[in-house]
Amino acid sequence: MNFDIKFDFQRRDRLGLIEAIWGQDKSIDQLERLCGNVLSKNEVVFITRINSEKANYLLDLYDDARFYEEANCLTIGKNLNKIITNKKVAIISGGTSDLAITLEAQLALETYGVNCQSFIDVGVAGLHRLMSQLEEINKYDVLIVCAGMEGALATVVGGLLAQPIIAVPVSVGYGISKDGETALNSMLSSCSPGIAVMNIDNGYGAAMAALRIIKSIS
């Protein structure tokens, strides 16, 4: 079936951001057409939630395509114009099971040339792990916190550090964890004031929120 591609090429001019492509629910044919359309405008392709079958197809088509399997993301083309800023973003994750979402956020920021660092496996079940990294994390200007299960990490970080905090509930856990809904509700009802909360597993959205913040304060 043919379909009209209405890609938002003006988004970069309006917002300084590009439109990412959601790979999960698109066919290989749709992705190929979208990539061709985007690249014809000398724009960068950034695909989220893409599996290895679709990624390998695009890797065969484009020499400069890169598949980041752990992040389930694929890029084609040169990096975007670098964001001229000395501001830094820390991405903090509760456990290694949160890694895909953490790396999605990190890759999105790195594509824009943002200086960022991931702090992996510092969840509240072993609070000493977070405390041992706290001095280093405090050197960053914006914090993204990714956590599944009960999602308490965002509240703890929000009670210890003053930076803008973007919380990402992760669909890790079983039973009452409800694919991230418990973490989402926990973050939304946090007693640490001023925490911004993204949708479940939205690492890319968290990265774009962080990008808006550092652009506005640079």
Q: Predicted segments — roles?
A:
Residues 132-170:
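Glycine-rich phosphate-binding loop
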Residues 29-31, 98-103, 127-128, 147-157, ...:
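Short glycine/serine/threonine-rich phosphate/pyrophosphate-binding segments
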Residues 84-126:
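Glycine-rich phosphate/diphosphate-binding loop of Rossmann-like nucleotide-binding domains
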Residues 73-75, 115-136, 181-182, 198:
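Glycine-rich oxoanion-binding loops at beta->alpha junctions
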Residues 61-63, 160-161, 191-193:
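Short, structured coil segments at secondary-structure junctions
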Residues 93, 97, 134-138, 142, ...:
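C-terminal binding/interaction regions
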Residues 1-65:
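Long amphipathic alpha-helical segments
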